[in-house]
Amino acid sequence: MKTNAFVLIFISLLALPETKGHQGLMATLFVQKSAEFYSNSIGIYNSAMDKLPALVEDKNYTAALEQTSGFSGKPPAVILDIDQTVLDNIAYQARLIENGRYYPDGWDAWCMEEKAYYIPGVEEFLALATSLGVEVFFVTNRTANLEEATRNNLEKLGFSFSTKLDQLLMKGEKPEWTSDKTSRRQLIADDYRIVMMIGDNFGDFVSLDVNRSSTEQRNNAAKAYNEMWGHSWFCLLYTSPSPRDATLSRMPSSA
């Protein structure tokens, strides 16, 4: 009966006007209920796990555009975005809809609750990376005031942070750490060979200027890196774009 009820709600919503609230509700139902959401996430992380061992072994390979030479002797690292890449914020999205509000209302409060769950496939990927001796870095556009809560949330899910380095790089943690993640990727590239990057927004892989360019320019840029996608770059895609996005209005993502 629950499945039938969901289908009836979903079909009924198709007849509604395309309001922001309607789009948000459709996306929330999709993420909460659908096999497609689960299979998309698991599929991407399974593919990433298949590729990771060989990338670790190939000392002459880097996944970072910021890293052009002198990296072969550096230890391997992976970079992951957090929101809708590692942590699932669908409960926050549902809360917005229930209260008739829009992002960023209540965003900081939600993060400080430390209740987000892993996206499907994340836990297994992080375990594999650790077993291969790969350092894990999280580069997020959550703001610096949310660092402790974000760290706590990840630790509650079982991730163990190093006591010797900063693996959680927040927006605004340093003056130069803006919405553009380039400087943070460069900082990691100074000491590590970046073998893989995982995100849910083009800006998790390229500069902010490229990410905020025209649709045609963004598409051309994406095509320029065909050999990276599905090899060392993995992008999770959801039907609901993040409100934080400059080009689309989607579920909170750290892009």
Predicted regions and their residues:
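Bacterial Sec-dependent N-terminal signal peptides
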Residues: 1-24
